[in-house]
Amino acid sequence: MTICCKDKQCSLSKIEHFHDVVGHCLAPHERLYADTILTLSSFGQIAEKQLLELEIRYDYVKIDKYVIMPNHIHAIIILEGAAGASPRPTLTDIICTYKSLTTRECNAVNKTMGRKLFQTSFYDHVITNEVEYQNVWQYINENPRKWGNDEYYI
């Protein structure tokens, strides 16, 4: 699943590449990807918190892998349980709620109202086998290191 910021605004994190990260102490809002440090902004920290809270809000949701890039979020979201067992929120419902809660909290922190943080739609893809799962997992894992070549890079 991929969610993009409105107008591709880089408001969630920043990415820096280093030749040598040995000895660099990471802050709680920083993530290390080989020679790359991803630093979450205050909005990115809210986006991460809300993403992880989806597992609490919906007992059948598992956030398996994710990355919060400067202007988009990638995640592997697993919807557990038997398909069609009972009516429950769909992935679209879950993402809509996620975007709404994240935007509302970011606007409260920024003391603005009505500002849109995300694009209206999102991209999803059903992973159908282990090879595809490994490819998507690896893509998410390597995305910060390849930021300069990313299709969402501006």
Model feature map: region roles:
Residues 2-154:
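Short catalytic/metal-binding and nucleic-acid-binding patches
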